[in-house]
Amino acid sequence: MSRLDTELVNRKIARSRELAKKYIKDGLVFVNEKNICKPSFNISDSDIVEYTGENEKYVGRGGLKLEYAIDKFNINVKDKICLDIGASTGGFTDCLLQNEAKLIYAVDVGSDQLDLNLRKNVRVLNIEKTDIRDFKKLYPNISFDFICTDVSFISLKKITEYAVELLKENGEIVFLIKPQFEVGIENIGKRGVVKDKKLHIKLLYDLINYFNMLGLDIIYLEPSPIKGGSGNTEYLIYMKKNQFGEQFKTFNDVEKIVSKAMTPTEKTK
């Protein structure tokens, strides 16, 4: 007997246990024609397991968010050295691989999260138990053409200066902005959702000003096509390292972007 989530990986139905758990909890897995929503459910080799969802393009749905940014903002990562901050299971890393990045440093404070196939890929360096704020001390001679970030439980203000320090001149950055980790706990509603439109506008302007202060030009800002796990509206911001002496490029259409992003029920305040 073995756990259902483990067996999904063994049978090549899911690429990782994290993805297997998601399939199961989303009600997409049947055992002997019975829907099972418990990852720890025990099955035998003779049990018939069926997955009823669509094939995943990336190991995590974050890959679809980065794919959207790459297509929308016309970003080219081919043959570039990239850094994925907060790699987790590797959705962003997988997307970079499929877009022909030369080498990807997948960094995360956790461990045993990155998809096994990504760990085996010679173009991926799996750097676990590492805070990006300590990265420069550990790898003092490395700089990056492209940096992407999808982090939780920490404000982007806590890590951006370290990312900029690692970025080559005229290097590119894509950040996924998650409002629930930027507005303060007192402004978070039920299930961790930030519904107040004014808070979205304020935090975006605040971050943009901060990014400019650190030497980044704001090229594009767009709502993510996929909401966060709790239903939060998220944003993708594309930036470049400013060339010394040039006037900073900023972004003034935040209200329009937020209105575009939020559903009518989210715009009530």
Locations of the language-model features?
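A basic, amphipathic helix-loop patch mediating RNA/tRNA/ribosome contacts
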Residues: 1-47, 81
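S-adenosyl-L-methionine
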Residues: 105-158
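Conserved alpha-helix/loop element of class I SAM-dependent methyltransferases that forms part
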Residues: 61-80
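Short, glycine-/aromatic-enriched active-site segment of Class I SAM-dependent methyltransferases
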Residues: 179-195
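Flexible, glycine-/basic-rich loop-and-beta segments that form/coincide
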Residues: 233-269
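Conserved class I S-adenosyl-L-methionine
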Residues: 78-88
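Conserved SAM-binding loop of SAM-dependent methyltransferases across substrates and taxa
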Residues: 89-101
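A short glycine-rich, Lys/Arg-flanked "PGG" loop and its adjoining helix->strand segment in the class I
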Residues: 157-174
